[in-house]
């Protein structure tokens, strides 16, 4: 048996029944959701985070395949000195442009060495897109984006966010790529990210079942 096959089999076994406290954990205080019958799935991420960059295409594709089962939301975390990246994401979000430019913003940081740490660097990024600069910076400097600074700070505390990427399912179930391979020894980042998907599938199904039973 090859190492790759052995890992794949272990992932399949793990995905059958993720364990609370290993592949996922319950938040101490569940948070409210507003997604009706659909299951809310939140990703906390940062553009500067290499692990978030590696996960982005995999998680984005997974979310698209869920169709009407879920509502997928992203929140850029807050750290001192990265407010410009936070504002960039939220400006894109307010303009309905996240899906179009999310991977491009990641690429700017990780491939093109534009650190997006200043307004000038963000302007350089915008100049290489089809975004209207005036419209973008109106959103970037808006009161709405400033209000989100405080909101996300509170959310990070409420959702117990200490590292990223972190995924929250149904406002109460936390997982991440590293949690998804708990106890599996040394694995590659690609293997971590691939192992996350069956855990997410299981958590979404669990949340759906429990939501239906509560009616």
Features from the language model and the residues they span:
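Long, low-complexity, intrinsically disordered polar/charged segments
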Residues: 1-3, 98-103, 134-139
């Amino acid at each position: 048996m090859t190492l790759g096959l052995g890992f794949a089999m272990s992932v399949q076994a793990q995905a059958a029944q993720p364990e609370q406290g290993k592949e996922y954990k319950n938040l101490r205080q569940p948070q409210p959701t507003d997604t009706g019958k659909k299951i809310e799935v939140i990703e906390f991420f940062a553009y500067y985070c290499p692990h978030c960059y590696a996960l982005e295409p995999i998680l984005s594709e997974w979310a698209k395949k869920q169709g009407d089962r879920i509502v997928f939301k992203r929140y850029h975390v807050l750290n001192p000195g990265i407010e410009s990246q936070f504002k960039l994401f939220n400006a894109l979000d307010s303009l309905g442009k996240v899906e179009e430019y999310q991977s491009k913003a990641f690429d700017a940081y990780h491939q093109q060495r534009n650190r997006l740490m200043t307004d000038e660097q963000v302007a350089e990024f915008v100049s290489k897109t089809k975004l209207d600069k005036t419209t973008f910076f109106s959103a970037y400097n808006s009161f709405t984006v400033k209000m989100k600074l405080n909101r996300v700070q509170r959310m990070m505390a409420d959702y117990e966010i200490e590292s990223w990427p972190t995924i929250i399912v149904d406002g109460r179930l936390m997982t991440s790529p590293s949690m998804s391979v708990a106890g599996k020894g040394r694995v590659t980042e690609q293997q971590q990210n691939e192992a996350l998907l069956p855990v997410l599938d299981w958590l979404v199904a669990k949340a759906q079942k429990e939501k239906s039973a509560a009616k």
